[in-house]
Amino acid sequence: MLVKSTTRHVRIFSAEVQGNELIPSNNVLTMDVDPDNEFVWNEDALQQVYRRFDELVESYSGEDLTDYNLRRIGSDLEHFIRDLLQAGKVSYNLDCRVLNYSMGLPKVENQETAGKYWLDN
């Protein structure tokens, strides 16, 4: 039986890819990162996500393979990707089909306003 978790930027399936098909498996998890290409990735950032995925899967070793457990892993990965975005390790893809800034508005450094705050009275 295929068990899956789908978040905005991470899709996890209890299956392996053969050709263009997902073949259900109780022993293999397959992850699709950022299927809508919302972000610009470098190889290092992508590898960090894969390593974090491996760590999370290992932490559930011995647990039942359930939708709930996969959703928890997917949710943790969403937070991890947000951390990468906020650290500047990935950025929004401005050529994406739809710009929705699902992880928050981009922050642009401006030398003239750095460290200054305005209060409207």
UniProtKB/Swiss-Prot annotation:
Q: Name one GO cellular component term.
A: plasma membrane-derived thylakoid membrane
User: What Pfam families would the database entry show?
Assistant: NdhM
The principal location of this protein is: membrane
Q: Which UniProt keywords apply?
A: Membrane, NAD, NADP, Plastoquinone, Quinone, Thylakoid, Translocase, Transport
Q: Which domain of life is it from?
A: Bacteria
Q: Which GO terms describe its molecular function?
A: oxidoreductase activity, acting on NAD(P)H, quinone or similar compound as acceptor; quinone binding
Reactions catalysed, as given in the entry: a plastoquinone + NADH + (n+1) H(+)(in) = a plastoquinol + NAD(+) + n H(+)(out); a plastoquinone + NADPH + (n+1) H(+)(in) = a plastoquinol + NADP(+) + n H(+)(out)
Q: What Enzyme Commission number does this protein have?
A: 7.1.1.-
Q: Which InterPro entries match?
A: NdhM (IPR018922)
* Key word Transport present: yes
Q: Where would you find this protein in the cell?
A: Cellular thylakoid membrane
Topology in the lipid bilayer: Peripheral membrane protein
Q: Does the keyword Membrane apply?
A: yes
Query: What is this protein's function?
Result: NDH-1 shuttles electrons from an unknown electron donor, via FMN and iron-sulfur (Fe-S) centers, to quinones in the respiratory and/or the photosynthetic chain. The immediate electron acceptor for the enzyme in this species is believed to be plastoquinone. Couples the redox reaction to proton translocation, and thus conserves the redox energy in a proton gradient. Cyanobacterial NDH-1 also plays a role in inorganic carbon-concentration.
Q: Which family does it belong to?
A: Belongs to the complex I NdhM subunit family.
Q: How does it assemble?
A: NDH-1 can be composed of about 15 different subunits; different subcomplexes with different compositions have been identified which probably have different functions.
- What is the protein name for this chain? NAD(P)H-quinone oxidoreductase subunit M
Organism equals Synechocystis sp. (strain ATCC 27184 / PCC 6803 / Kazusa)
